[in-house]
Swiss-Prot record:
S-adenosyl-L-methionine binds at residues 127, 156-157. It comes from Mycobacterium marinum (strain ATCC BAA-535 / M). GO terms for biological process: methylation. Exhibits S-adenosyl-L-methionine-dependent methyltransferase activity. Keywords: Methyltransferase, S-adenosyl-L-methionine, Transferase. This is Putative S-adenosyl-L-methionine-dependent methyltransferase MMAR_1068. Its EC number is 2.1.1.-. Belongs to the UPF0677 family. GO terms for molecular function: methyltransferase activity. Pfam families: LCM (PF04072).
Length: 302
């Protein structure tokens, strides 16, 4: 499964399948005895996509050997920690008065339905038309009701998504909470820069941004992709996920944002595991160990 500059997908193929994969992990994490996230929509969304492996994974119906059990727990913990980090980011921004949020590459993200948004909150979901349409249909069938004003922006991030966002009512004069969750590695290095340029150009002072990145050299991307794929193969996944990441040297996210007017805070993934009461895995999981979580505030100190 190799990327091209004009490739497209649905939730059962290519990059779209990773959204289903992450939703399956959220379902697993939500079903734990002491969960740190609660996503009641993850499992039904995964079932609706119809990929057998991810459906069985979401419902805990896959038998594993000892290694695969460790992999499954690592997947659930990693996605739970990441999800909680972004949940907390949005809720903190809301407490600080931000009422406009944008979820880039929203996939099967259900935050517009499951977070306790303050009155007056507007949540924009940006993704490809087929992905948005699928989620709209499925959530409607589930009888789900958004907890904020939800506005969908049906556009590929490789196209003029800022114009599409503004066309759907986005207010550039108001501070915004932006998320780029699990996104950067699926963009070419130059597209990552353009994404941050666009966000900066749309952001009023006081806007906030959350993302995550690997600070190690781009030359190691292929190795990380193989580690990522091997873990899912051990769990029984028959979809090759190793060709989805773009290689090449990337801008350091912290440096790039700082140079473009953002006040940035960065924390290693290990710290988040500790904060949320999860045990960080052994040192051999270098793919996970190098991840840095980033929050930033535009035009003023955090």
């Amino acid at each position: 499964m190799t990327r091209t500059d004009q490739d497209s997908w649905d939730l059962a193929s290519s990059v779209g399948a990773t959204a289903t994969m992450v939703a399956a992990a959220r379902a697993l994490a939500s079903a734990e005895a002491n969960p740190i996230i609660d996503d009641p929509f993850a499992a039904p969304l995964v079932r609706a996509v119809g990929l057998d492996f991810f459906t069985r994974l979401a419902e805990g119906e896959i038998d594993h050997d000892e290694q695969a059990q460790r992999d499954r727990q690592l997947v659930a913990d990693s996605i739970a920690v990441r999800t909680r980090f972004f949940d907390d980011f949005f809720l903190d921004a809301a407490r600080r008065g931000v009422r406009q949020s944008v979820i880039l590459a929203a996939g099967l993200d259900a935050r517009a339905y499951r977070l306790p948004w303050p009155s007056g909150s507007v949540v924009y979901e940006v993704d490809q038309p087929d992905v948005i349409d699928f989620k709209d249909t499925t959530m409607s069938a589930l009888g789900a009701v958004p907890t904020a004003t939800r506005r969908t922006v049906r556009v590929d991030l490789r196209d003029d998504w800022p114009a599409a966002l503004r066309h759907n009512g986005f207010d550039t004069t108001q501070p915004t909470a932006w998320s780029a969750e699990g996104l950067l590695m699926y963009l070419p290095p130059d597209a990552q820069d353009r994404l941050f340029d666009a966000i900066s150009g749309l952001s009023a002072p006081g806007s906030r941004l959350a993302t995550e990145y690997h600070p190690d050299p781009g030359s190691t991307m292929a190795e990380r992709a193989q580690q990522f794929n091997q873990r899912w193969v051990r769990l029984g996944c028959d979809i090759d996920l190793s060709g989805l990441f773009y290689e090449g040297e990337r801008s350091n996210v912290v440096d790039y944002l700082t140079e473009h007017g953002w006040h940035v805070a960065a924390r290693p993934r290990q710290d988040l595991f500790t904060d949320y009461g999860r045990v960080f895995p052994d040192a051999d999981t270098s793919q996970l160990r190098s991840i840095v979580a980033v929050t930033a505030t535009f035009g003023e100190a955090g």
